[in-house]
Amino acid sequence: MHSFNKDIGSLGEDIAKNYLNQIGYTVLERNFRCKVGEIDIIGKDGDYICFIEVKSRYGKLYGNPCESVNYPKRLKIYKAANIYMLRKKLFKFNFRFDVIEIIFNTYNDVPSIKLIKDAFQI
């Protein structure tokens, strides 16, 4: 990944974390990594443990950011989520997979933020 893309991704994750805190999520962990993949943000929303993929883009030239969360990516997130839940012994919790789209624009410094709850299931 190019440095510019990493910077956009990191900025998007910072914005997403702040947004989630504002709407009542509790952020439990960021950038959870294991042998099968990575989860950008793990949070708690009510009774749910949420595994959140953050997708950041400048504009929609290549479609909506959430469209890049394809089946292979979903499967990696799912496998990483299972490992996280086993390690933390979170068997009794409900869980779901959310996606946050962050779209930066050239007109102002205010990005568009869209949270898609229960964005996919495996």
UniProtKB/Swiss-Prot annotation:
The terms under GO molecular function for this entry are: nucleic acid binding
- The organism sits in which domain of life? Bacteria
Query: NCBIfam families per the record?
Result: PRK12497.1-3 (NF009150), YraN family protein (TIGR00252)
Family, per entry: Belongs to the UPF0102 family.
Put simply, this protein is called: UPF0102 protein CKL_1410
